[in-house]
């Protein structure tokens, strides 16, 4: 994983790469944005780059030093992750804060990634705040959330805030094309457009729907098969209704709407 592999967040990843290159790092970062746009992935890439012993000129991790190898092999003792959705008690935070006292063994920093940080209990937030107010010099926190408004203002004020954008449809389509070519999957561009629209700005959702469509279509993703698999109403139906209305064919409109309802769609939408 590299910063360049993060889709649709170029300005944000450039800023993070520049921070790695300059060595001017904050003690706390807050990554905000909708689900599936790369917050946790970016946090991991950033954490690895921060501790890389020989970062590239572009601010990417070298993937060759001991710190990078340890991270890639999931045996790093300097990068910790906590899923606050399922570990949100004050005891969980206190256990994590105990780790901040021990300096890093390999690399420059101990990096703590707390995902879904808004799920922490009030007591846990208060316990975390004590460390955040006066963090050890060797500690960096990267917090990720989909609901920034639920985080205490005293926490937010101590973080550098990065707002992740929703994926655009063209960005999603371009990435899905790359995935399709890599996997040897053929596709119709209209089909990828339907998948991108269905993902609602989330790359993770887009990839999940893409995998589902690829399985259903047996490696040849077509528009007709995708709308059938995803139960999406064909756009031609809308045009047909408009044409019939312009021709004052009320009876035909009712027949078409009835057929749509019989397929399980809600005529009101």
Predicted regions: what is each one?
Residues 1-161, 179:
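P-loop/Walker A NTP-binding region and its immediately flanking N-terminal helices
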Residues 73-76, 92-95, 108, 160-269:
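Extended, largely alpha-helical regulatory/partner-binding modules appended to the mid-to-C-terminal parts
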